[in-house]
Amino acid sequence: MSPVKQRLLRIAVSHNRHPSLSEEQFHQWATKEHCARAARIHSRHGIEAYGMLFSPETARTTVQNLNRQLGGRWKIDEHDVTVEFYLHSLDELTSVLEDPEFKALQQEEEPYVSGEDIVATLGWVETYVQDGRVVNVDSEGVPTYPGFGVLADFSSEQVNQK
C-alpha cells in the first residue's frame, strides 16, 4: 500500500493595482521591490511555493477572444494580479501573516495595491501532468489521490477551531 499523499492546498488572492499606476509601473514594483522580500518570508514559514500571476489588459483581451471562440461561457477575471500560495496547512499562511516583517511589507503595499474588490479562493491541487508526463495515476488509470472526503476535510485547520 503506498503512503497517503499529503494534500497540497492553493490559496489565491486576486488584487487590482492602485488606479494611479500603469500596469508596467505596478509590475515593476511587484517584481523589483516586493516579491523577493515576500518570498524570503514565505519560505521561512514553510510555504511550499509562492508566485504571482500577472494579467495585463493584453492578456485579458486575449482570453476574451479565446472565450468568444469557445462560445463565450467564461466570466473573465479582471484583476491585475493573483498571488498564489501553495502549502500543506493554512497554519503556514497564518504564521506569515503574523510575522512582523511581513506586516511591515504589507504596509508598504498601500500606494501600489488597491484595497478594493479583493477575491480569494482556497482548494487543493491534484496534478495529473507534470514536466510533460502523466503523474499521480496508477497502472490501471486510477488517480492515486485520497478520496474526496479526505481531501475536502478542512476541519483540522486552526481557522476552523476558533
Swiss-Prot record:
Described by its record, this protein's role is as follows: Putative oxygenase; part of the gene cluster that mediates the biosynthesis of isoflavipucine. The PKS part of the PKS-NRPS ATEG_00325 probably assembles a triketide from an acetyl starter and two malonyl-CoA extender units. The poly-beta-keto intermediate would then be fused to the leucine unit by the NRPS part. The resulting amide would be liberated from the PKS-NRPS through reductive release of the linear PKS-NRPS product from the enzyme complex.
Q: Where is the signal peptide?
A: none
Annotated family: Belongs to the tpcK family.
Q: What is the lineage of its organism?
A: Eukaryota, Fungi, Dikarya, Ascomycota, Pezizomycotina
Coiled coil feature spans: none
In Swiss-Prot or TrEMBL terms, this protein is called Putative oxygenase ATEG_00329
What's the top EC group for this one? oxidoreductase
User: What does the entry say induces or represses the expression of this protein?
Assistant: Expression is positively controlled by the cluster-specific regulator ATEG_00326.
* EC numbers on record: 1.-.-.-
